[in-house]
C-alpha cells in the first residue's frame, strides 16, 4: 500500500504539482540515487515550497521519506504546521483548572540538571536547562492531571534543540551575550510540546506504568507476526519486552541524545524518527522501529542467548541480558539505523491490525485514537475527555492491583503463622484438610464482615492449632487435622434453623 493512501490526498486539486500522484514515490526514489548533499538541497527546496503553500498533506508524506524534513531550520516549521493541524488549542480557553505548582516539579529540576551534558558552553547549557524546566513546568501546571515521568525531559529536549539549532549553531552569535528565549519562537515551541504531549504521550503520563506496559506488549505481538522463530526463541509469550521501556518512553531520545557539537548523523536519525512519528501521527511507529531493530539483530541475539544459557538461573534474565548486550553495542551503528528506518518506511503502513488486537489496550490509549496512524484533527474537549477517562481507568487499575496484592499478602501471612505450629513435613491429607479450611476462612471473611465471625474464627483456629502444638504428636501418623473444615467454618455466623 503506498503511503499517500493514508493521507487521503485530494489529487484533483494538485494536478500540476510535480509531487502528486505517482510523483511522490518517483521523486523520493530519485533522491536516494543522489549524493547526500544534493539530495538534502533538492528536498529542502521542495519542503520550503510546501511550507509556503501550507500543504500539510504533502508535508506528511515528505516527512516519512528519506532525510525526513532535512534540517532543523525547516523541521521546526514542519512540526508546527503538522501538530497545529492535528490539535486545535485556544490559548484563551482554560480547559482544566491550572495549579500554581505541580507535585512533580522537584523531579523535573533534578532531571534538567543532568540534561544537555554534551553542550560545552556553560552559559548555553545553563540557558537550555532553564528553558527545559520552564517548558515542562508550564505543561504540568496547565494540565495538572498529567504526571511527569523520567524520560519526558528527553523528549522535550528534542523539541528545544530543534527550535534553537539555528540560534546556537548557524548564526555565529556570541554565546555569552546570547538570550535563548529572545531568539526562539517560544509560543510555537510550546504549542508543539503541548500538542505532542496531549496527542502522543498521554499513556505514559499516568501515575503508574500500566498503560506503558500495554504498549510494550505490542512489540511482542509485532514480532510474533513478523518472525515466529525469534518470537519462540525469546519466549515472548512468557517474557515481556521490559528492556524496551527506556527507548519507547523517550521515542529513542535517551538513546540518541541530540546534545553534542555539530549536526552529526545520529542526531539526524533521531530527528527523522520524530519526523516520521509526527508525519504519520502514530505512536505505533516507535514500536515498529523497535521491532525492526530487534529483528535486524536477531541472529546475534540468538547467538548471545545460546552462549550464555549456562550462566543465568532463569530465562527472563538470560534473554533480556542478551538483547541489552547486543543493542548496546549497535547503538551508534549509523548504517544499522538507516536500514531500520528504511524497513520501517516500507512496513509501517502495512503492519497488521491483528498485532494490536492481540494486545489488551485501554480503550482511550493514544494508540487507538489521537496517535493511531490515521491523520486527523482533534479538538481540546475530546482530548480532555480522553485524559479524564484514562486517569479514572488508571486509578481503577491501581485499586484492583492493590486489593489483589493485599489479599495475597494476608493469605501469605496466615499460611506463615500456621507454619509456626506445624513441622515441615506432615501427612498429605492433613495438609489438604488445612488448606481447605483456609480457603473456607477467606471465603467467609469476604462474604461476611462481622466482628463476631472474626472472633469465632479466631477461637476455632486457635483450638485446632492448640491440639497440634503438643510436642509428642507425630504428624506423620495423624490421619487428619480438620475433619470437615468447610462445614465448621461456613456455619459460623449463621443461626441454627
Curated annotation (Swiss-Prot):
Q: What organism is listed for this UniProt entry? A: Saccharomyces cerevisiae (strain ATCC 204508 / S288c)
Q: What cellular-component terms does GO give this entry?
A: cytoplasm; endoplasmic reticulum membrane; peroxisome
Which residues does UniProt assign to the signal peptide?
none
Keyword Membrane in record: no
Corresponding gene?
Answer: GYP8
**Which Gene3D superfamilies does the protein's record reference?**
1.10.8.1310, Ypt/Rab-GAP domain of gyp1p, domain 3
PANTHER family from the xrefs? RE60063P (PTHR20913:SF7), TBC1 DOMAIN FAMILY MEMBER 20/GTPASE (PTHR20913)
InterPro entries (UniProt xref): Rab-GAP-TBC_dom (IPR000195), Rab-GAP_TBC_sf (IPR035969), TBC20/Gyp8-like (IPR045913)
Q: Which domain of life is it from?
A: Eukaryota
Keyword Disulfide bond appears in the UniProt entry: no
Q: Which PROSITE patterns match?
A: TBC_RABGAP (PS50086)
Q: Name one GO molecular function term.
A: GTPase activator activity
- Its GO biological process terms? endoplasmic reticulum to Golgi vesicle-mediated transport; vesicle-mediated transport
Q: Which residues form the Rab-GAP TBC domain?
A: 69-281
- Could you tell me what this protein is called? GTPase-activating protein GYP8
Q: Which UniProt keywords apply?
A: GTPase activation
Amino acid at each position: 500500500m503506498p503511503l499517500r493512501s493514508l493521507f487521503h490526498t485530494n489529487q484533483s486539486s494538485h494536478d500540476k504539482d510535480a509531487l502528486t500522484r505517482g510523483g511522490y514515490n518517483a521523486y523520493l526514489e530519485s533522491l536516494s540515487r543522489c549524493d547526500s548533499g544534493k539530495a538534502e538541497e533538492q528536498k529542502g527546496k521542495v519542503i520550503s515550497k510546501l511550507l509556503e503553500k501550507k500543504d500539510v498533506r504533502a508535508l506528511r508524506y515528505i516527512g516519512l521519506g528519506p532525510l525526513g524534513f532535512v534540517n532543523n531550520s525547516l523541521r521546526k516549521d514542519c512540526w508546527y504546521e503538522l501538530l497545529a493541524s492535528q490539535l486545535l488549542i485556544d490559548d484563551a480557553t482554560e480547559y482544566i483548572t491550572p495549579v500554581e505548582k505541580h507535585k512533580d516539579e522537584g523531579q523535573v529540576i533534578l532531571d534538567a540538571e543532568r540534561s544537555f551534558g554534551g553542550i560545552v558552553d556553560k552559559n548555553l547549557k545553563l540557558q537550555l536547562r532553564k528553558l527545559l524546566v520552564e517548558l515542562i513546568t508550564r505543561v504540568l501546571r496547565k494540565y495538572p492531571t498529567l504526571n511527569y515521568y523520567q524520560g519526558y525531559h528527553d523528549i522535550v529536549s528534542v523539541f528545544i534543540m530543534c527550535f534553537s539549532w539555528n540560534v546556537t549553531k548557524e548564526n555565529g552569535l556570541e554565546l555569552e551575550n546570547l538570550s535563548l528565549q529572545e531568539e526562539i519562537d517560544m509560543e510555537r515551541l510550546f504549542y508543539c510540546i503541548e500538542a505532542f504531549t496531549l496527542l502522543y504521550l498521554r499513556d505514559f503520563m499516568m501515575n503508574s506504568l500500566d498503560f506503558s506496559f500495554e504498549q510494550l506488549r505490542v512489540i511482542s505481538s509485532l514480532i510474533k507476526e513478523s518472525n515466529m522463530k525469534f518470537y519462540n526463541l525469546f519466549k515472548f509469550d512468557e517474557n515481556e519486552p521490559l528492556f524496551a521501556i527506556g527507548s519507547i518512553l523517550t521515542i529513542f531520545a535517551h538513546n540518541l541524545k541530540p546534545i553534542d557539537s555539530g549536526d552529526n548523523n545520529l542526531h539526524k536519525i533521531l530527528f527523522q524518527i520524530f519526523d516520521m512519528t509526527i508525519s504519520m501521527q502514530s505512536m505505533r511507529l516507535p514500536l515498529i522501529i523497535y521491532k525492526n531493530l530487534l529483528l535486524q539483530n536477531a541472529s546475534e541475539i540468538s547467538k548471545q542467548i545460546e552462549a550464555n544459557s549456562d550462566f543465568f538461573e532463569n530465562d527472563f534474565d538470560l534473554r533480556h541480558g542478551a538483547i541489552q548486550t547486543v543493542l548496546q553495542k549497535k547503538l551508534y551503528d549509523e548504517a544499522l539505523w538507516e536500514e531500520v528506518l528504511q524497513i520501517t518506511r516500507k512496513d509501517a503502513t502495512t503492519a497488521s491490525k491483528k498485532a494490536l488486537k492481540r494486545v489488551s489496550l485501554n480503550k482511550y490509549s493514544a494508540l487507538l485514537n489521537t496517535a493511531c496512524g490515521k491523520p486527523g484533527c482533534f479538538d481540546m474537549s475530546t482530548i480532555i475527555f480522553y485524559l479524564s477517562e484514562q486517569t479514572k481507568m488508571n486509578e481503577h487499575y491501581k485499586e484492583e492491583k492493590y486489593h489483589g496484592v493485599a489479599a495475597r499478602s494476608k493469605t501469605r501471612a496466615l499460611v506463615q503463622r500456621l507454619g509456626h505450629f506445624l513441622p515441615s513435613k506432615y501427612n498429605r491429607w492433613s495438609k489438604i484438610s488445612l488448606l481447605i479450611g483456609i480457603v473456607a476462612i477467606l471465603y467467609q471473611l469476604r462474604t461476611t464482615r462481622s466482628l463476631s465471625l472474626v472472633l469465632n474464627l479466631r477461637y476455632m483456629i486457635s483450638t485446632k492449632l492448640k491440639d497440634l502444638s503438643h510436642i509428642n504428636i507425630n504428624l506423620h501418623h495423624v490421619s487428619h487435622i480438620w475433619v470437615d473444615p468447610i462445614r465448621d467454618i461456613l456455619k459460623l455466623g449463621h443461626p441454627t434453623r
